[in-house]
């Protein structure tokens, strides 16, 4: 009888929560969310460590693991994010002793702990009692199809809007956070793990979408107009007429669904952040680990408003593919979310991948160089995933610092060397502030909308093959060009109020935008800013409807041209006369707009008997600034040359652009107020470079460095020069 009453009370609580969630589903995520003003984020040195899962170990070795971490020099671990079934092995029965002993052991060794809320992998009893929690995943085909029902056995298989799931998650979070609130070893909380929408299309998700549309558009008639639903006679007369996402053909519907999916993720993490703050200590920070950046269904910038500090999991190429570019892209974006420092919660320890088909252990020196790469972009913490390789299951070959034998190895020796250096120079590296004069405008709406109407697909007409190039590849290309040119960059967003902090704004394929954003870009140019913009910009409005005006719509005056036609390119074309002197890189592909200059100057023309009458690249002086427009998709080499030309005109080039190709440099100001200059050699060959800044000290060896001195960089090595006299004893032990 008591168990029945307990179960009945639980069901009543869930029913009450369901009513509350249904009401809340009608509201969008809050416009703003405040991060804690009390969390202690004044790190005195770099946090360096690993994820640790004692529960995975084949035998009892906690003391040995902690001793090895301490000997290696680690000062932080991240734990607990995958362990709901251990915290709560049965409904309502909580156990803490298994984690208490691990936290206590870390504390005695002076190793700090970040605990994760273990909500991304549900226990078996929950799936059994509430099968409705499992996701019904979106099944998008040309002619629609029912959602695909998830089953138990994989992580991230739940509907995070489910009232039952929210009930159990809240109960668990409150228990765990309150338990460790006053534990001095626990310094922060990670919300969930690599959260996304999981493509959930459950009934409650769809009902929430209906309520969201009703609030946003007001009436079905307004929605019909915005989405152009008279097409194919698909207009609706009541909100109940709205079709489910699976079969919807409307580009407006598809775009709005992606926004709704993003808002669901934001709401979920804001909800968790509020719960954690209610029960935690003000000294404990709140973060979440983004599973990389620039996702289609995660609004990273909105989520960041609820965090004390963002965190990101960054994986990258190794061996001959280790060049720092992946870290640069991910971490420029992460730093831009709050214009602040960030944490790296996961990065390569040894090999990665879910199979044994992609096993490339880093060369000697690459693990060490990788740590400093993260720090040079503003990371205050670097943690490996993970401490010890797992003996079975999905991530058997995603190796940790220790291999499956759990013994010291080459990776352990290299991270120990790195930790020894960080113990000496960490206070000089933490809290690095980076000032960029170039920004890239990132539009998640354009990413998604171009995905619905791709400009470069494999196969022929009606094949609907995968894209061979898209918005993401274009953004990556343009960022990579800046990286290769040793230009630091930030990311800005469609919500950015103005762009005046930057001398050069790069706008890749801004396919979706409202008129207000177009005006802000035009005003930026008029007031002296420089813009490099690409094809498809200004074409469609915020509802993914093409504007009823000559392209590029509101940008026409600032761009100085218009166009009425465009064409796919079946094969790459050259530009007449190789105007940017790039030799075999003088190629464009995929897409060509027939630009008709009105005030703009033609910079380059297609070398083609028909298309050759229209320029491929134009530049327009508008007010005090310029707008350079690429009407086609440039080759990588050509893109780099075009951006270099724009940087020169904006006065943003100097000695950094004269460095050898394998050498990359990063600059910033540390918490001591001194300028730092990181020089990286991403190659297996020794390189000599000329140091171009004020005299200082190489923090890694303590030796003075004069202006114009030659720096010798060994293979996969670096130098870190701090300007002026150093304040700590830095000579190597």
Question: Model regions: which residues?
Answer:
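Bacterial N-terminal signal peptides
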Residues: 10-19
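Aromatic-lined substrate-binding rim segments of carbohydrate-active enzymes
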Residues: 63-72, 76-143, 174-177, 272-280, ...
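N-terminal carbohydrate-binding accessory modules
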Residues: 26-78, 89, 104-108, 112, ...
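Carbohydrate-binding surfaces of carbohydrate-active enzymes
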Residues: 239-242, 270, 282, 315-733
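Short, acidic/polar
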Residues: 56-71, 171, 175, 292-303, ...
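The substrate-binding groove and active-site-proximal loops of carbohydrate-active enzymes
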Residues: 48-57, 82-97, 151-170, 192-199, ...
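Polysaccharide-binding and catalytic clefts of secreted carbohydrate-active enzymes
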Residues: 136-309, 313-326
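Conserved, mostly hydrophobic/aromatic
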Residues: 50, 69, 77, 106, ...
């Amino acid at each position: 009888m008591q168990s029945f009453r307990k179960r009945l009370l639980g069901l009543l609580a869930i029913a009450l929560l369901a009513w509350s969630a249904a009401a809340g589903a009608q509201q969008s995520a809050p416009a703003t969310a405040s991060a804690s003003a009390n969390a202690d984020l004044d790190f005195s040195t770099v946090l360096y460590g690993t994820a640790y899962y004692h529960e995975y170990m084949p035998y009892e070795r906690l003391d040995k693991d902690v001793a090895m971490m301490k000997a290696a020099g680690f000062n932080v671990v991240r734990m607990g994010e995958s362990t709901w079934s251990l915290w709560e092995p049965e409904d309502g029965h909580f156990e803490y002793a298994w984690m208490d002993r691990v936290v206590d052991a870390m504390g005695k060794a002076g190793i700090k702990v970040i605990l994760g809320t273990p909500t991304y992998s549900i226990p078996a009893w929950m799936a059994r009692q509430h099968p409705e929690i499992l996701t019904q995943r979106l099944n998008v085909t040309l002619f629609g199809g029912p959602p695909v029902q998830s089953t138990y056995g994989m992580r991230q298989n739940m509907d995070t809007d489910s009232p039952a799931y929210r009930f159990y998650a809240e109960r668990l979070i409150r228990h765990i956070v309150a338990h460790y609130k006053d534990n001095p070893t626990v310094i922060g909380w990670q919300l969930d793990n690599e959260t996304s929408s999981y493509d959930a299309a459950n009934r409650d998700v769809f009902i929430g979408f209906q309520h969201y549309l009703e609030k946003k558009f007001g009436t079905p008639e307004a929605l019909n107009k915005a989405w152009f639903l008279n097409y194919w006679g698909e207009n609706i007369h009541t909100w109940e007429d709205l079709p489910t996402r699976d079969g919807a053909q409307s580009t407006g519907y598809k775009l709005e669904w992606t926004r709704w999916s993003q808002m669901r993720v934001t709401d979920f993490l804001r909800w968790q952040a509020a719960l954690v703050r209610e029960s935690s200590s003000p000294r404990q920070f709140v973060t979440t680990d983004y599973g990389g950046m620039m996702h289609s269904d995660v609004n990273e910038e909105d989520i960041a408003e609820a965090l004390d500090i963002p965190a990101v999991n960054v994986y990258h190429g190794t061996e001959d593919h280790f060049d720092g570019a992946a870290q640069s892209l991910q971490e420029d974006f992460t730093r831009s979310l709050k214009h602040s420092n960030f944490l790296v919660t996961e990065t390569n320890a040894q090999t990665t991948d879910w199979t044994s088909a992609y096993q490339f252990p880093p060369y000697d020196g690459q693990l060490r160089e990788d740590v400093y790469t993260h720090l040079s972009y503003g990371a205050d913490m670097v943690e490996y995933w993970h401490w010890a390789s797992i003996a079975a299951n999905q991530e058997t070959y995603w190796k940790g610092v220790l291999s499956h034998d759990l013994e010291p190895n080459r990776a352990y020796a290299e991270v120990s060397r790195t930790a020894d250096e960080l113990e000496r120079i960490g206070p000089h590296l933490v809290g690095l502030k980076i000032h960029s004069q170039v920004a890239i405008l990132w539009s998640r709406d354009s990413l998604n909308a171009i995905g619905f109407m791709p400009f470069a697909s494999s196969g022929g007409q009606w094949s609907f093959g995968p894209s061979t190039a898209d918005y993401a590849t274009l953004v990556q290309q343009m960022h990579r060009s800046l990286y290769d040119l040793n230009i630091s960059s930030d990311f800005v967003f469609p919500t950015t109020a103005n762009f005046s902090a930057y001398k050069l704004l790069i706008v890749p394929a801004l396919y979706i935008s409202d008129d207000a954003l177009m005006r802000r870009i035009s005003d930026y140019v008029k007031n002296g800013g420089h813009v490099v913009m690409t094809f498809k910009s200004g074409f469609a409005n915020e509802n993914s409807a093409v504007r009823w005006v000559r392209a590029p719509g509101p940008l026409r005056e600032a761009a100085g041209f218009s166009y009425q036609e465009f064409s796919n390119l079946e094969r790459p074309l050259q530009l007449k006369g190789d105007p940017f002197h790039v030799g075999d890189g003088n190629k464009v592909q995929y897409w060509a707009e027939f630009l008709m200059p009105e005030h703009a100057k033609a910079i380059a023309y297609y070398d083609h008997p028909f298309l050759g009458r229209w320029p491929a690249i134009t530049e327009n002086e508008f007010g005090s600034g310029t707008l350079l427009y690429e009407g086609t998709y440039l080759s990588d080499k050509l893109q780099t040359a075009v951006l270099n030309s724009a940087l020169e005109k904006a006065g943003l080039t100097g000695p950094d652009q004269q460095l050898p190709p394998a050498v990359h440099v990063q600059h910033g100001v540390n918490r001591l107020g001194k300028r730092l200059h990181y020089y990286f050699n991403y190659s297996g060959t020794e390189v000599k470079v000329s140091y171009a800044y004020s005299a200082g000290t190489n923090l890694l060896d303590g030796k003075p460095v004069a202006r114009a001195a030659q720096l010798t960089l060994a293979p996969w090595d670096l130098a870190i020069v701090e300007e002026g006299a150093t304040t700590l004893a830095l000579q190597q032990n």
